[in-house]
Amino acid sequence: MGKKLKYIIDLKFIEEIPEEERRELEKVTEKFAFRTNTYYNSLINWDNPNDPIRRIVIPTTEELEVWGKLDASNESKYMKVHGLEHKYPDTALLLVTDVCGIYCRFCFRKRLFMNDNDEVARDVSEGLEYIRNHPEINNVLLTGGDPLILATFKLEKILKALAEIPHVRIVRIGSKMLAVNPFRVLDDPKLLELFEWFNTETGKKLYLMNHFNHPRELTKEARKAVELVQKTGTTLTNQTPILKGINDDFETLKTLLEELSFIGVPPYYVFQCRPTAGNKAYSTPIEETIDLVEAVRAEVSGLAARVRYVMSHETGKIEILGKTDEHIFFRYHRAADPENRGKFMVFKRNPEAHWFDDYTELVAEYKSSLSGVS
């Protein structure tokens, strides 16, 4: 399959979609880009119109419902130079590509795949210079797009440049490639050699932040790719949004977290689906989702249970801690403003809320003593 894998950017090449349905779905792809591949399509049960893998990659007319913003977390606010975001003091994001192995229908950066977008830096030299000039940055996240879509020699140039910056200790690669095209790893020993070099020869550490959304993505090929990357000394973790019709039921989420822990890819975050344009069909109410997450955490091992349920809000990563009959509790896990670090907030419940901004009745807030620590 690896060498024969083909990418598909036009629905007309997917024979399993009837022509009448395809014409309706093309109204969606005129607005939001479409991309899949033959390997990922092979995971779909085409007899089930609500198949979760299908929902991840095949458009639905529900995406045309007006809702949310293209830049729901206002990432542009933190763009310091072309292609670089600097939101938290110790962390920089480099947007290195505007292409992925597939385009998830719920992507919070779907704006990058639009013709008029210019946020990604194909030449990262300006971003690298910014990092060199900011010694507080000790870890860099390569993102996009999917950095593993880049040719290995291009990724090598970026990693070698980062390896030469003394204060950068950790490089993270945010990628769904092992889920959507594990042959990127299986068929490219040079990529594995690059990862091993970075971990053993630079005095620094590489992390691969995976995006497995559903247990059926954990195929034998994906598991083998995980194993090969682990052998390079790279640490693997996973993060996924909670997605309606994909992983928002107890058994699916429990299985996903358990299997990830078993193969050595411990869950890191489960995210509230961002209110990005086109995403309403995938978003779940916060107060239902916290019940789901807590129920699953109560039934899995400690390795899986340590996952945090958070929102990537404009102001920072806000953890959803729990609720009572009347109130819901939040805490800043990461805050852009030092004054908000560790802040604990109590709001009156809102069963219709899908995002932090939907909570308007603040009951109490408590500043952490951390806010004064530097």
From Swiss-Prot:
Which UniProt keywords are given for this protein, alphabetically ordered? 4Fe-4S, Iron, Iron-sulfur, Isomerase, Metal-binding, Pyridoxal phosphate, S-adenosyl-L-methionine
Quote the record's cofactor note: Binds 1 [4Fe-4S] cluster. The cluster is coordinated with 3 cysteines and an exchangeable S-adenosyl-L-methionine.
Ranges for domain Radical SAM core? 86-314
Gene3D superfamilies (alphabetical): Aldolase class I
Broadest EC class? Answer: isomerase
- Pfam families attached to this UniProt entry: Radical_SAM
| Name this protein carries in UniProt | Putative L-lysine 2,3-aminomutase aq_1632
